[in-house]
Amino acid sequence: MAKLDIRTKSCLVTGAAGGIGGATAAVLGRERARLVLTDLDQRALDARADALRAAGAEVLVARAVDLTDAAAVSRFADEVHAAHGPMDVVLNIAGISVWGTIDRLTEDHWRRLLDVNLMGPVHVLSSFLPPMIEARRGGHVVNVASAAAIFGLPWHAAYSASKFGLRGVSEVLRFDLRRHRIGVSLVCPGAVATPLVEGLEVAGVDRAAPSIRKVEQQFLRHAVTPEVAAEAIVRGLRRRRYWVYTSRDIRLGHLAQRWFPWGYSLAMRLLNRQLTGAAAKAGVR
């Protein structure tokens, strides 16, 4: 497919109140895209929309929607389409994270992660893709997964399940939508310094413990800013890339997983040992 000219394109951005979603909306706004924004917090979303408009961006809609509610997403889509027509680009960025070993993760943890990280994007795609297809002018879908959709990271069983699921959806749509001239990008960020990290829940572990704080600081030392991640996302969108990485370490790790599986396996074992040791020092709640 030819490169995508983002100017004047209608772009839906979920998770737009802050973090990667907010930064991506800002980059798209500078590219003169027409923005439809959603998140859970209407007040934070309004503040983001005001800041974007003050910077010269065109914000068509900024509406709080619970993406886990299929009916609410459908109503939102109907309102957007009635007022502004089909979207040209859909960016599924909203997400949550919970870490924990399998014996500490609860049924609620699994449900919340799958509902938000997998079914949320599914609801968005189900409501916004049909009009995009019917418009017959092409388009693009961006699904933001995670490095946890590539690697078997320790304590990520439930989170990885949700993100591997989104990766699977993306892999199928990559080929299903091609005949409609709709491209698909799968974004796999590594460490990104966002509020998601600050509010991260680690099941059954005291996050305030020095050993856990040390692990978090090591994580953040490798983190890129949301702005760097957003630039990578929009660059991948413009070039219609399928695999989009926000940092070099994830790209290299993905190559190592495929071509040096013994090295990948060793790295995962060492990382698992490090986190297990940190949890043992912190104590289990």
Residue spans for each PLM region:
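Canonical Rossmann dinucleotide-binding motif of NAD(H)/NADP(H)-dependent dehydrogenases/reductases
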Residues: 2-36
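Conserved glycine-rich Rossmann-like NAD(P)H-binding loop of the short-chain dehydrogenase/reductase
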Residues: 31-48
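The beta1-alpha1 cofactor-binding region of Rossmann-like NAD(H)/NADP(H)-dependent oxidoreductases
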Residues: 42-43, 64-75, 107
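Substrate-binding pocket helix/loop in short-chain dehydrogenase/reductase
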Residues: 101-102, 106-114
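Active-site helix of classical SDR
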Residues: 125, 162
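SDR active-site lid
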Residues: 179-248
